[in-house]
Amino acid sequence: MKRKRIDIITLGCSKNLVDSEQLMRQLEEAGYSVTHDTENPEGEIAVINTCGFIGDAKEESINMILEFAERKEEGDLKKLFVMGCLSERYLQELAIEIPQVDKFYGKFNWKELLQDLGKTYHEELYIERTLTTPKHYAYLKISEGCDRKCSYCAIPIITGRHISKSMEEILDEVRYLVSQGVKEFQVIAQELTYYGVDLYKKQMLPELIERISEIPGVEWIRLHYAYPAHFPTDLFRVMRERDNVCKYMDIALQHISDNMLKLMRRQVSKEDTYKLIEQFRKEVPGIHLRTTLMVGHPGETEEDFEELKEFVRKARFDRMGAFAYSEEEGTYAAQQYEDSIPQEVKQARLDELMDIQQGISAELSAAKIGQQMKVIIDRIEGDYYIGRTEFDSPEVDPEVLISVSREELEVGQFYQVEVTDADDFDLYAKILNKYE
């Protein structure tokens, strides 16, 4: 008997992706054939997992829903369901505006979708997922929500307060994923450093990472989305002592000006920030720091922006992203501040900041020529094998390109390489040997 096909479309962040992967596993158990983010959706049923973080993400989600609603009207789709952050925030409004959708779910009640299809949610599969990533790496979500009160951020409004997963559940999930061939774990949360405070009454991230690192088969652990205030400094020891904890930290700093940090309600100062960066580099030699910065938040003066540029020049981040402020309804900034900085000024500041970082990135990449590094091969693309070092997270960071013609390599395997060339972003390398 031919199985019914369901198309899952995931928009937004890697935390959303984990939810989609859990749903896919449940749907497969229920007897469906499931595809993810296909360019040619042909299923009888579609599920769109939406993002509602900023204006562009909301627009993308709405356009995707409308595209599938049109397919349904044309008879190419029998059922259409929507879940995720956008529908968590605007469920009633969306249901009125887009009646072609059979049902909208929030971010946390997607299990009801199975019941609405006449199927059962299998509790015993709670740690299992159908991976959409290459089989050698996976995202590991350790908590939901956020207790921070940053002025510009709608995430706490959408996802609610911080809720940690239990340590044992996380460790069970890691063991399961290792059994499926996963070697590399991107540990993610809206706010990593708060992990455990709700369950264990203290920050437990260092202990969690240490315990994950002890599981046989875990080759790389990479940490994403830390917060600078009240950073759990015992994590430095874990990163220094454990070879399979990557010397990499993704920590969103947003700004450096004390004026802006106060307006953003970041609970951290310029002095605190510089001290934390210095401590990272002293305590964890060789660490690569990724950060995210914001320009154009209400109240940002030219002096504040000059201070931010000087910070980028001094800090010399290994990886950096930046974005322009966009007003999000319901946030403190939207209620208390006037979004008075013109869009063209925001964009000009963003471009200028990224130009500075591009020069820094080019210098840091060029300095790696001649170095030997351990890489994992993600895929083959054109004339190159595409790999990453421990300092590179999938999708967002530089890659290592190795010519296909030189040697046949295995996707998902580790190799020792020598860097032979570099551009502003990526490295080029030759193979020395395979890690057994």
Curated annotation (Swiss-Prot):
Domain Radical SAM core: 132-363
UniProt xrefs under Gene3D superfamilies: Methylthiotransferase, N-terminal domain, Nucleic acid-binding proteins, tm_1862 like domain
HAMAP family xrefs: MTTase_RimO (MF_01865)
Cofactor(s) needed by this chain: [4Fe-4S] cluster
Gene encoding the protein: rimO
Domain MTTase N-terminal: 4-122
Pfam annotation, one family: Radical_SAM
Chain positions recorded as [4Fe-4S] cluster 1 binding sites: 13, 51, 85
UniProt: [4Fe-4S] cluster 2 binding residues: 146, 150, 153
Cofactor note: Binds 2 [4Fe-4S] clusters. One cluster is coordinated with 3 cysteines and an exchangeable S-adenosyl-L-methionine.
Entry EC number(s): 2.8.4.4
Compartment(s) where it occurs, according to its Swiss-Prot or TrEMBL record: Cytoplasm
InterPro entries noted in UniProt: Elp3/MiaA/NifB-like_rSAM, Methylthiotransferase, Methylthiotransferase_CS, Methylthiotransferase_N, Methylthiotransferase_N_sf, NA-bd_OB-fold, Ribosomal_uS12_MeSTrfase_RimO, rSAM
UniProt main location, coarse: cytoplasm
Name of protein: Ribosomal protein uS12 methylthiotransferase RimO
Catalysed reaction, written as an equation: L-aspartate(89)-[ribosomal protein uS12]-hydrogen + (sulfur carrier)-SH + AH2 + 2 S-adenosyl-L-methionine = 3-methylsulfanyl-L-aspartate(89)-[ribosomal protein uS12]-hydrogen + (sulfur carrier)-H + 5'-deoxyadenosine + L-methionine + A + S-adenosyl-L-homocysteine + 2 H(+)
Domain TRAM as annotated: residue spans: 366-433
GO-annotated molecular function: 4 iron, 4 sulfur cluster binding; aspartic acid methylthiotransferase activity; metal ion binding; protein methylthiotransferase activity
Gene Ontology biological-process annotations: tRNA modification
Keywords: 4Fe-4S, Cytoplasm, Iron, Iron-sulfur, Metal-binding, S-adenosyl-L-methionine, Transferase
4Fe-4S recorded as keyword: yes
Role of this protein: Catalyzes the methylthiolation of an aspartic acid residue of ribosomal protein uS12.
Family affiliation: Belongs to the methylthiotransferase family. RimO subfamily.
